Amino acid sequence: MSRPSRRKLAYGGVAVATLAISCGTITPSSAAGQVLWTPSTSKGASSFASVQCASGNFKVVNDAAKGKVWRAYQAAGQERCETLSPDLKNGDTFYLGWSSKVDIKDANSRYVFQLKCDPSTDTANHPIEIDATDGRIRLQEWDTQHVSHTLWTAPTANGQWHSYALKIRLGRTDGTIDFWFDGKKQTFTTGSGTFKGTTWDGNRNYLKWGSYHPSSGDATNTFTSPVMATTLEAATAGS
């Protein structure tokens, strides 16, 4: 499958408060923005605060299109293979950028990205998530009553690389989400390019990449090192 063309993205600077980051790399600021966090494939899994995966199923691999990337392999019957990092701070605004391809061996969806909150009960659980099946990718927001709101969908297929970028302002009821897919700003099902709602809940929030939801078939999420940054340009430079 051909690699999607890379496009130069328009961006705007934004003031970003200090994030509770414990792992990964931080780079100095520049006119193009500051990278706040990104894991290193050279450093390996220790770049993340934790990895929730069966032994040997999360690793760095070489991809013909992207070079060194992360591979999260969720074997049939296993609940998840996910990374966890970094922790977030309510009220902050930041950009995220990465590329991913999936290989899902059944018809059930897997979460390939989560903005997760603790505790899981009596909260949104995962205020923002992207889930995939073989044929469809979807972005959803979950409110404080744990009710899902589909914001966007697009067709996809196993083995296709796609790029993702999010601008997130964290808030329990007044958070915002903007989204870019394969370099293009997306319009949500609401008709707007910015969604306002729940992007934070509970007492701890953090980011997860990988594959989640137990099922009868294997699933693999291969992804580039995610970048958290103060601008869209900085977050997507390596995607």
Language-model features and meaning:
Residues 1-16:
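N-terminal export and membrane-targeting signals
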Residues 4, 18, 22-25, 31-162, ...:
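Low-complexity, Ser/Thr/Pro/Gly-rich disordered linker/stalk regions
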